[in-house]
Amino acid sequence: MSCCDLAAAGQLGKAGIMASDCEPALNQAESRNPTLERYLGALREAKNDSEQFAALLLVTKAVKAGDIDAKTRRRIFDAVGFTFPNRLLTTKEAPDGCPDHVLRALGVALLACFCSDPELASHPQVLNKIPILSTFLTARGDPDDAARRSMIDDTYQCLTAVAGTPRGPRHLIAGGTVSALCQAYLGHGYGFDQALALLVGLLAAAETQCWKEAEPDLLAVLRGLSEDFQRAEDASKFELCQLLPLFLPPTTVPPECHRDLQAGLARILGSKLSSWQRNPALKLAARLAHACGSDWIPVGSSGSKFLALLVNLACVEVRLALEETGTEVKEDVVTACYALMELGIQECTRCEQSLLKEPQKVQLVSIMKEAIGAVIHYLLQVGPEKQKEPFVFASVRILGAWLAEETSSLRKEVCQLLPFLVRYAKTLYEEAEEASDISQQVANLAISPTTPGPSWPGDALRLLLPGWCHLTVEDGPREILIKEGAPSLLCKYFLQQWELTSPGHDTSVLPDSVEIGLQTCCHIFLNLVVTAPGLIKRDACFTSLMNTLMTSLPSLVQQQGRLLLAANVATLGLLMARLLSTSPALQGTPASRGFFAAAILFLSQSHVARATPGSDQAVLALSPDYEGIWADLQELWFLGMQAFTGCVPLLPWLAPAALRSRWPQELLQLLGSVSPNSVKPEMVAAYQGVLVELARANRLCREAMRLQAGEETASHYRMAALEQCLSEP
């Protein structure tokens, strides 16, 4: 058979390809075409390759392009099977005068015909051809060769059909298709636009797996698209705005892409545009904000103006969408604007290396305040039936970000919304699995309807904790939160989150957000201890909380790198113990003794004696573990010392326990070994407070302090109260 006959037989694949677009059903008369039936019979009875070629050519002539339906294609497959196209794809012996790629082209054409049947597209015999098909996309050859072009078209037809099956994307990724598509696109050869379209589909279906298998190649495509975006002067820049979010990696965007992406966005957003042109640009900017923060925006005047423009546009879009009652909200666009507003909040509150100058910050805060007012207005309209909608979650998120930094403005509106926020947080807390699903849906909204973005926190309460921490200091908001049951909800939430830190969980992979959430809960409880002590005494949830603090602190203080959380737990527990001192759980039980021993460990290990060059006397210095975080720790430490001092007269067993720990003796020994000039007055006051109460509470403590030169040390440090106490019998 001649090479021309082979090419003609290949037109069967073309019939199948065109049929995949048209799919007209054969009527009963056509389905019984006697000529076609005879040729199919010949195809089934063919005894060698030459006879199969001839029969295929006859079938091609009997079936007009576009007149083949799924049933007929299946009958052709039943007659041909996979063995023949398999040989065509792998053979290295072509007829004289016929390029070997013509045989492969015919094999691919047959596969393309078969793959238009979804059942055949997922057949193992098709799936195991993925690596071979992928190599065809990047094979070198004459770009004007019709057979080669036909083979490339058929290859994309096969791969696209496989991608449309349920498990197809996974097989394509495993077969090296993503890298091949990237190389085909970057080569800009024939069919490169089809490569990009298929890449988009695979990234939409399995982003994480694509990046895991082909990160270098995908980054190369991103660099190419970014350069095209920066150079584009025509409508293609808007198309690239739609594509680029799909090609941003799940971790971080390469710095070499930052300039091109920012320049392209600046040119688009700085022009007068319709919404369909502007909205994709806002979404792309939001995705970049998620991935890079503000790192992708250049430092200097142009960068600050661009950031101000972004936040301005986002705030205007939010107000237009949420202030007009009855208008349809473009939730994906508004959610993207929320991300840009959050970027604005971060930059406005950044003290060092902020992109914004002070006048710009003042202006943006005013603009964002109006947009947050629109968000509050929207949330006040939300009924119970909408509380599980992702857009509501996104709206609560941006409000939480605002309240974390600013609670003095919009105070009346915030107080009006607080009952809703407590109910909303409680609803999602009680349905944690659905809340996690909502979180992912919100991430999808921020980017596009098809592409998942960075995960957002899975519970609304964590978003609101920083704002509630500020609000519990103020009388009005605190009363509303207490009335709506927020303290009880916070206790339950704290206990649930604490379970994640228990020995049964791998705390080495504990998300930072969990520990930060626990610390913020502690701060809220500290506010309530100080401002609403009666609540702590009467609400049973705080008794449960106290029990958890007592049983947890002993192991927590031993864990490396968790000193700040231990400080929060210790200080909160000490302050609550002072209020709950009559509770049976605090009457010298093993749990209470373990807690106070751990609290003493935290308080006693903060400072050490450190030798100084050229001096015979050491100085009081922070211990290495405390030194790096003392700025965050010192307020808790001083508060903890004060709370421990207050517990000593209320718990008779505590002074003997402290004596057995040797804390008072070691404290006096430390003070005696350092220069008094190196001990700050506030440290002297804190140490004296503890030593005086221990001495007053227990005779054995007084005797032990005297033996440790307590009176002499008290005199050196001008601790009059301690000196007087130790001088008494």
Curated annotation (Swiss-Prot):
Task: Write down the membrane topology.
Answer: Lipid-anchor
UniProt keywords, alphabetically: Acetylation, Cell projection, Cytoplasm, Endosome, Lipoprotein, Membrane, Methylation, Palmitate, Phosphoprotein, Synapse
Annotated positions of the N-acetylserine modification: S2
Q: Which residues carry this modification: Phosphoserine?
A: S2, S448
Where is this protein chiefly located? cytoplasm
> Post-translational modification, briefly?
Palmitoylated. Palmitoylation by ZDHHC1, ZDHHC3 and ZDHHC11 regulates the association of NCDN with endosome membranes. May also be palmitoylated by ZDHHC7.
GO BP terms in the entry: bone resorption; neuron projection development; regulation of neuronal synaptic plasticity; regulation of postsynaptic neurotransmitter receptor internalization
- Lipid-substituted positions (S-palmitoyl cysteine): C3, C4
**Could you name the Gene Ontology cellular component terms for this entry?**
cytosol; dendrite; endosome membrane; glutamatergic synapse; neuron projection; neuronal cell body; perikaryon; postsynapse
Where does the protein end up?
Cytoplasm, Cytosol; Endosome membrane; Cell projection, Dendrite; Postsynapse
What is the consequence of disrupting this locus?
A: Death between 3.5 and 6.5 dpc. Heterozygous mutant do not display gross anatomic abnormalities. They however show abnormalities in developing cartilage. Nervous system-specific gene disruption by conditional knockout results in epileptic seizure. Displays no overt neurite outgrowth phenotype. Shows a behavioral phenotype associated with a rodent model of schizophrenia, as observed in alterations in both sensorimotor gating and psychotomimetic-induced locomotor activity.
Cite the record's tissue specificity text: Expressed in the neuronal, chondral and bone tissues. Expressed in dendrites. Enriched in the brain in the surface layer I-IV. In brains, protein level increases in male but decreases in female with advancing age (at protein level). In adult brains, it is highly expressed in the forebrain and hindbrain. Highly expressed in the hippocampus, piriform cortex, septum, amygdaloid complex, medial geniculate nucleus, inferior colliculus, cerebellar nuclei and the nuclei of the Vth, VIIth, and XIIth cranial nerves. In bone tissues, it is expressed in osteoblasts and osteocytes.
Alphabetical list of Pfam families matching this protein: Neurochondrin
The domain of life is Eukaryota
For the modification Asymmetric dimethylarginine, the affected residues are R75
Describe its partners and assembly state: Interacts with MCHR1. Interacts with SEMA4C. Interacts with DIAPH1 (via FH3 domain). Interacts with GRM5.
Tell me, what does this protein do in biology? Probably involved in signal transduction, in the nervous system, via increasing cell surface localization of GRM5 and positively regulating its signaling. Required for the spatial learning process. Acts as a negative regulator of Ca(2+)-calmodulin-dependent protein kinase 2 (CaMK2) phosphorylation. May play a role in modulating melanin-concentrating hormone-mediated functions via its interaction with MCHR1 that interferes with G protein-coupled signal transduction. May be involved in bone metabolism. May also be involved in neurite outgrowth.
Q: Which family is this protein grouped under?
A: Belongs to the neurochondrin family.
Q: What is this protein called?
A: Neurochondrin
Species assigned in the record: Mus musculus
